[in-house]
Amino acid sequence: MSKAPSHLRVIFTGTPEFALPSLRALAGAVQLVAVVTQPDRPAGRGRRLSPPPVAVFARECSLPVMQPPSLRRPEVVRALAALNPDLLVTVAYGRIIPDDVLALPPLGAINAHPSLLPAYRGASPIQRAIADGQTETGVSIIYQTGELDAGDIILQQRAAIGPEETAGDLERRLADLSATLLLEAVRLIAEGRAPRRPQDHAAATYVGKLTKEDGRIDWQRPAEAIVNLVRAMDPWPSAYTFRAGPQVKTWRARA
């Protein structure tokens, strides 16, 4: 039996600013029974414990927040099960969600990923697409499985990458697009009309987490590749080189 989206009991999992447009959109469309995000981390020069952006926003909206150190703990799984969720929605949570949690909601678990899957599965699809010189990317809404970003596709939309667009610029646009597509996917799921298109796993490509070393400029590479790296590493970790000893960060480049 289908439900109106406003009657769906939804658990949201997400952590960084990228997830905020989606959380904001869902907060006005469904019953958010829990917002699950990562624990507070040391940040800034003083390394003081700071909550992630999703936790800050959720508390401002009086939404119930959970920050478990691990979703694999039995007591955490029991607490989530007690919420009787219909659906689980993930946007950039930053950790693999275990099968025990994915199996809780009867309508399944879905994820917004900022690439045209099966390309750029993994943790840094926006930065890698720019660094590779791609002129197009997009957002995929998929069903979550135990395999990284490998679930069936519900919705997918393309987005151009501007010739001077940085990772920060593109991330903001794709965050908004993710929110729009997620709302549509939730509506289709609630109505029992969500499509499922299997991914071509043979065509999958993978990208890992960014490190500071990824920003180091290799001057032996073509000029266009260096320009793309500078765009891809803005705002973090930033492209850099060394000149007479000190590290020099590079924010803009032209070929």
Q: Where does each model-flagged region fall?
A:
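N-terminal Rossmann-like dinucleotide-binding module
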Residues: 2-46
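Internal anion-binding site segments
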Residues: 2-3, 201-255
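Internal alpha/beta domain cores that form substrate/cofactor-binding pockets in large enzymes
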Residues: 9-11, 33-36, 64-83, 88, ...
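Amphipathic, non-transmembrane alpha-helical secondary structure
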Residues: 20, 24, 77-81, 183
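Structural motif corresponding to alpha-helix initiation and N-cap regions
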Residues: 20, 48-51, 73-77, 95, ...
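Donor/substrate-binding cores of folate-linked one-carbon enzymes
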Residues: 28, 38, 87-206
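N-terminal beta-loop-helix "entrance" segment that forms/cooperates
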Residues: 41-61
